[in-house]
């Protein structure tokens, strides 16, 4: 097997992912944020259930992913941007001159890591939140729950890949996080309540994520949601991710490290 075969490059990038401490730290942070906040929401709702408007056990479990995603954005940005800040990207390109192959291996290793971490985070958060809800809980086999959990895993995985693409475009972890964290944490969630901006902001990645997780509702129920369904949400999220990754590849191919 050639040292620059796809399998060898993927193995090398996988090793890089897990030899930096930031990978474990960011995944742990995502776990703590998602599970901790999801469980707290569930406990609070259970203790005051008669005053909860539009009670939905899925929202109690999965809304915390809107905070947990921020750690996965940081993970994606660091996996790429740290090589630029340290200068090790030059060494990587010397070892693997085929930039598309290197980029593909890096993105795939990061995406697989995000997928594995997201699966654990989503399942544990759901189970913990449902345990906290007690008699108001729902089960894994309830209609709509498996697709919502799968949607949450897909969303968290793709948002990490999206972050990797943006970090490659801007060639900096800090700049990528400076763009994405405010956008996902404050942007469409806050600005989405402005009627004039809704037609545009409803197509941003985080809004598609709400739809995928089945925790977005129509404006009539008090929660801002895009309302275009899971299929369209997945297409929108894939389009954003593909655009970011393709842009990242074009920048990597066309500019010196």
In which residue ranges do the predicted regions lie?
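Hydrophobic/aromatic positions within or immediately flanking transmembrane alpha-helices
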Residues: 27, 90, 103, 177-178
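Amphipathic cytosolic juxtamembrane alpha-helices at the membrane-cytosol interface
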Residues: 97-108, 179
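Transmembrane helix boundary and interhelical loop/hinge segments in multi-pass membrane proteins
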Residues: 73-95, 99-100
């Amino acid at each position: 097997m050639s040292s620059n075969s796809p399998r060898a490059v993927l193995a090398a990038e996988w090793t890089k992912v897990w030899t930096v401490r930031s990978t474990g730290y960011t995944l742990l942070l995502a776990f703590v944020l998602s599970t901790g906040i999801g469980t707290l929401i569930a406990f609070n709702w259970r203790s005051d259930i008669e005053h909860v408007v539009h009670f939905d056990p899925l929202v109690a479990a999965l809304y915390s992913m809107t905070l947990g995603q921020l750690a996965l954005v940081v993970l994606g940005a660091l996996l790429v941007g740290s090589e630029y800040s340290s200068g090790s990207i030059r060494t990587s390109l010397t070892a693997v001159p085929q930039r598309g192959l290197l980029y593909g291996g890096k993105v795939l290793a990061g995406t697989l890591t995000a997928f594995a971490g997201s699966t654990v985070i989503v399942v544990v958060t759901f189970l913990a939140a449902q345990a906290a809800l007690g008699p108001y809980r729902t089960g894994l086999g309830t209609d709509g729950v498996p697709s919502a959990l799968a949607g949450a895993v897909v969303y968290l995985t793709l948002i990490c890949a999206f972050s990797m693409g943006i970090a490659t475009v801007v060639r900096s972890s800090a700049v990528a996080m400076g763009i994405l964290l405010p956008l996902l944490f404050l942007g469409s969630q806050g600005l989405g309540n402005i009627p004039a901006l809704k037609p545009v902001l409803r197509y941003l990645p985080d809004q598609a994520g709400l739809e995928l997780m089945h925790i977005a509702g129509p404006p009539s129920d008090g929660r801002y949601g895009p309302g275009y369904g899971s299929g369209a949400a997945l297409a929108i999220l894939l389009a954003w991710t593909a655009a970011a990754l393709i842009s990242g590849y074009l920048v990597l191919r066309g500019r010196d490290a």
